[in-house]
Amino acid sequence: MSALPQAAPAASAHHDVLAIRALIAKHKRWDYIFGLLGLLALMVGVLTFAALFAEMAIQGIPRLNPDFFTNFPSRRPEQAGILSAWVGSTLVMIVTAIVAVPLGVGAGVYLEEYGSKNWVTDIIEINITNLAGVPSIVYGLLALGLFVYQFGFGQSILSAGLTLALLILPVVIVATREAIRGIPRSIREGSYALGATQWQTVKDHILPYSSAGILTGVIIGMARAIGETAPIITIGALTFIAFLPASPVTATPPFLSFEWLFSPFSVMPIQMFNWTSRPEAAFHQNAAAAGFVLVLMTLAMNGLAIWLRYRLRKNLKW
């Protein structure tokens, strides 16, 4: 008689164990399915990029030779090159970096370390986030009215650099803030405990420890800017240019010239756009070669960001 009451709880416990095991097995199946779907989505993106990159490589590599990098554009596709385009891209990126990096890093540091948390900073943060999603051609329209006409910079390298600096500024600000947020509070408290001022703490501790994340954001932003076409076309960049801007370096004191800032220019995406609009297949091959070079430059910049982040984080420990 006493065995019956004991058997009932044992059977109930066994049933509960089986139910839990079935639930765990179900969750594992869903985990497996979700992981498989994620891998499939990743492979679609990677394979699509690989196919496009391979197509550009197959078409463009035969055109890659020293003359392609040292010749100006030409009506004859076999003689055309990207000299003015890659020089223009380089100079525009220099202006972009000089403007965007100090402003972006400074704004990020202020918002995280100095700015009070109130409705004003909340509005600023929301606007920064929204600016990151604004179509690039809107920046081009803004630059056309402001830099080209209002400030009188004209259709120049300076206007292009300032336009792209505005474009990547939200990226640099967000990257700076995220990097600073990752620093433990104990770093700041230890610095203040030793009598350091807020500026000394930022200069000697916050910025060095967050440099990996900041550099990553800056390089990724620059990699985006180098491939932009819409804002550069909007401000009036040339699609055909057979001369180089004035040299930034001179043979006489002060050995620096800023005339190049106001020179007409072209960049690699616009040169590609010009070639793809031509009916001749040889120009399309030139566009593929220029695209291959541009993708390699972008991959190199992203690879540099990953390497710098790894090296800096390896050397900085807390």
PLM regions: where:
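Transmembrane alpha-helical segments of polytopic membrane transport and secretion proteins
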Residues: 1-42, 306-318
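Periplasmic/extracellular loop-to-transmembrane helix junction in inner-membrane transport proteins
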Residues: 17-40, 54-96, 117, 274-285
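Hydrophobic alpha-helical transmembrane segments of multipass integral membrane proteins
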Residues: 87, 91-99, 103, 107, ...
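Transmembrane alpha-helices
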Residues: 97, 175, 198-236
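Generic hydrophobic transmembrane alpha-helix motif, especially the helices
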Residues: 129-166
